[in-house]
Amino acid sequence: MKKVAHYILLNKNTPALSFACTRNEFGEPEFVEDSWLVNYRPIGYMNLTSFLEQRKAPKHRRHIKELLERYGCDDLEGFLKVTHALSLNDTFWVKPASSSLTWNDVSLYRNEFDQLISEAAFDGTISASDLSSISPEFGTDGYYAKCWMREGPDIYLYKSGSALHEIEPLSEFLAAQIAAIICPHSVSYDLDFHHGKLISKCKLFTSEHVG
């Protein structure tokens, strides 16, 4: 008889979907919807497995494969257990059905990020210390190394470029100048240095209210 683990997808503190996870004969996790508890779906939702997969950082992103493996996130159920499928794109998250965790306990918007995870995501230096899993790094897409950092009350995305020329941050900065002429409400990018590397950085433009 297959062991069944039960989970809940929530929007902040509102349960949205109950679902189950079993393991097939190859030990791979398989997810099945049990019951929708709200009359809406996350934007772009097609099916449960693809929705959850899309919340996981791609392994081709620089330094992220090692970070995912370090935390036991190399399969999708491990990812859910460690990260709760949190993202700075929206307010959906996952917890075991028996868990008493609340949105205030896990929210990336409200809680401090683990600084060591941010540094590992940016430069590949992975500490052997026990780390907190409150971090947006596990769910951030893209190819080049990047990390989320707090500057006072605000959250910024730091993005590096290729190891050889580092022209990508400059290109992004220049593109933002053009965009500002065309659209006054475009996202602003600045240039800076982080650990001696040229970066582009932009302020987070989502929130708990706007995704």
Language-model-detected regions and their locations in the chain:
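Phosphate/dinucleotide-binding and metal-coordinating scaffold of catalytic cores
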Residues: M1-G211
